[in-house]
Amino acid sequence: MKLKYSILFISALFAFLAWQNNDVAITEHNYTNDKLPNKFNGFKILHISDLHNKKFYGRLTNKIKKINPDIIVITGDLIDRRRTNINSAMELIEDIVKIAPTYYVSGNHEQLSQHYTKLKEELNKFNVINMDDFYTAINKGGSEIGLIGIADPAINANEKAHLSENNVRYVISRLNHLTKNLKTDFNILLSHRPELLNVYKKFNIDLVFSGHAHGGQIRIPLLGGILSPNQGFFPKYSEGMHREGSTSMAVSRGLGNSLFPFRIFNPPELVVVILSSMS
């Protein structure tokens, strides 16, 4: 009898973990800013982050088709540096570039992977716009908004529990350069690291898209995530919308896992942000 109940318990546990790690949630945020050109009212941005080689076998693509975004932004860690599988990432990329223009910045796993050059080549084949340390304008009906991207600071090959001063200086240096002569009033930043919101808010940035935190990996109802890289226990920025000063930030819980192999009360997530102006 004890063996029977043990088997039932283990089976139920595995079923629960499989559900928690594969049932993709769609989180929608409405973002309003009077600096946004009227032409961008209702502009829909789909945010993908932290795939870490995970395969969803078409289910993710079907959800994205139904969302029907105007653009797709990816904030890093498409691959996992410990078990890199570029093909898994490119299977998703090949599908989503047919849905909407796709913009990408690197995460720490790309920057620390010996396969990153190959990944960039593959992304380029599918016309994914690499936004690492780059600025561009998105045009809609003659109006424009700015899109800025920064490479993950692990480009300095320095991965520690907390970002080093050199890495923070790198981010500040790149943002100083990229925001120096902006031609757009409303500007979006793509950056893998949410813990640097206090840095981003010092620049002419209205909305940030970020990932990296994996939702805190295990979430406790009413308390939130338990642990995130570079933020430690009970991270402040593990999911959802945050605001400091005039800068708002959308943090994705991500889609895959890295060192820790499963999520609890923290399903994989697609984030949708719908823009609107005050008028």
How should these model regions be labeled?
Residues P221-P235:
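Short, surface-exposed loop/helix-turn segments at secondary-structure junctions
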Residues K35-L36, T117-L207, S238-M241, G245-M278:
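Conserved catalytic scaffold of divalent metal-dependent phosphoesterases
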Residues M1-F40:
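N-terminal membrane-anchoring alpha-helices
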